Amino acid sequence: MRNRMRKIVAATEENKEEILKLYKIQLGREFCPWGDSYPGMKEIEFDLGRESLFVMIDGQEINADAGSKEDRIIAAISIDDDPQVERLDCWSSRLAPGAELSRLAVHPDFQNQKIARQMLVFGMEELARRGYKSVHFLVNKLNVKALRSYAVFGFDTVGECSLFGQPFLCYEKSL
């Protein structure tokens, strides 16, 4: 008997290496703005220290009778706290306080299954639980796949910026 279950949970210290592998597997993929040093263990530890890193676990029962299970992290998202992003003048003061969702990653084997959207929904719900009025994030202007994925949520494009050597569109949405 095979059974598959996916769930989104807060990441733990034990997940650090697997999350780092998930980030690194994104490098070199089309439109990925990340480099060898970002995101790295520093960002993972920063996010864990603020209880702001969440992962989707794909749990697949190998043998239900024996109770053995193999869990795998297939996606991650962070609630970021980046002063450079927060200082951008495009964010609406009427929607303050707002927070940024970032470092969204989906394992290549699980892409095109709407997992990124599920992670965004979870992230927005978590921000609302924490008392934020809005969510904002940056998307590389050339990342057509991400732009398409985010379009279904009705985010407002509130500006453009160049940070970290990348051209970004600035998105914001009331929660």
Model region roles, listed by residue range:
Residues R2, S162-L175:
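Terminal substrate-recognition subdomain of acyl/acetyltransferases
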Residues L120, L127-L138:
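Conserved GNAT acetyl-CoA-binding A-motif
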Residues A151-E160:
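Conserved acetyl-CoA-binding loop of GNAT-fold acetyltransferases
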Residues V106, N112-E125, R148-V152:
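Conserved acetyl-CoA-binding loop-helix of GNAT-fold acetyltransferases
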Residues E14-E18, P39, V144-K145, Q166:
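Short alpha-helical
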Residues E13, K24-D109, L120-V121:
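Acetyl-CoA-dependent GNAT
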Residues F137-L147, L163-P167:
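Conserved beta-strand-loop-alpha-helix junction that forms the acyl-donor binding cleft
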Residues R6-K21:
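A short beta-loop-alpha structural element at the N-terminal edge
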